[in-house]
Amino acid sequence: MSKLTKRQKTVGDKIDSNKLYALSDALGLVKEFAVAKFDESIDVAVQLGIDAKKSDQVVRGAVVLPNGTGKTKRVAVFAQGAKAEEAKAAGADIVGMDDLAADIKAGKMDFDVVIASPDAMRIVGTLGQILGPRGLMPNPKVGTVTPDVATAVRNAKAGQVQFRVDKAGIVHGTIGRRSFDTAKLQGNLAALVDALIKAKPATSKGVYLKKVAVSSTMGVGVRVDTQSIAA
């Protein structure tokens, strides 16, 4: 059996994998052991009390994190005329229609979010096989297909994140960076949990927020007492 490294022993001494920590304490531990040479992301995994195999229990949506994500997102918008001008004024990085679609088909995808006005979906629909697998396909359920493209752009720039439950009933998300103070991370997680609660399927029975754990990109995971997450 291989010997534990000094860091692994320190983590093992300080973090009890069976304990539920108050959110502030959990985040403090995650930040303490996030020792990579870059500003690690602080991530969360939420186990929901749903049956992800049932179509009426798929949890999906978007939420603007009050303290941002620590990453500046580049936003592309499919719009024309007045809507295109509104998108540019709101801070969109790329705005177009057929020209933007041609760039995407050519492999030019220097953006993190794609937004479309409803009338542009005739063009965007042809890009499903390219945008879909990358999680970039606009969808009205998360506010990225909308006549109000300006608000959608501002939300994306302000730190909006999309969430969707996976096949195991878990929602994964990023709530900030190691450099964020604990209060900002707490506020972001509370906003995400509030959005998940609002998206609870009517057919979901029993305990909805079953397990919550926080971690960093290269670091340890710490379980959180759900009662300590104040929305």
Curated annotation (Swiss-Prot):
Q: Which Gene3D superfamilies match?
A: 3.30.190.20, 3.40.50.790
What are the BP-aspect GO terms?
Answer: regulation of translation; translation
Cellular component annotations (GO), alphabetically ordered: cytosolic large ribosomal subunit
Q: GO molecular-function annotation terms?
A: rRNA binding; structural constituent of ribosome; tRNA binding
Is Transmembrane among the key words of this record?
no
Q: List the disulfide bonds.
A: none
Stored InterPro entries: Ribosom_uL1_bac-type (IPR005878), Ribosomal_uL1 (IPR002143), Ribosomal_uL1-like (IPR023674), Ribosomal_uL1/biogenesis (IPR028364), Ribosomal_uL1_3-a/b-sand (IPR016095), Ribosomal_uL1_CS (IPR023673)
Q: Keyword annotations for this protein?
A: Repressor, Ribonucleoprotein, Ribosomal protein, RNA-binding, rRNA-binding, Translation regulation, tRNA-binding
Question: Do you know which PROSITE patterns this protein is assigned to?
Answer: RIBOSOMAL_L1
Q: Which Pfam families match?
A: Ribosomal_L1
**Biological function:** Binds directly to 23S rRNA. The L1 stalk is quite mobile in the ribosome, and is involved in E site tRNA release.
User: Which family does the UniProt entry place this protein in?
Assistant: Belongs to the universal ribosomal protein uL1 family.
Q: Which HAMAP family match?
A: Ribosomal_uL1_B
Query: What does the subunit section of this Swiss-Prot or TrEMBL entry state?
Result: Part of the 50S ribosomal subunit.
Question: What's this protein's name?
Answer: Large ribosomal subunit protein uL1
Q: What is the lineage of its organism?
A: Bacteria, Pseudomonadati, Pseudomonadota, Betaproteobacteria, Burkholderiales
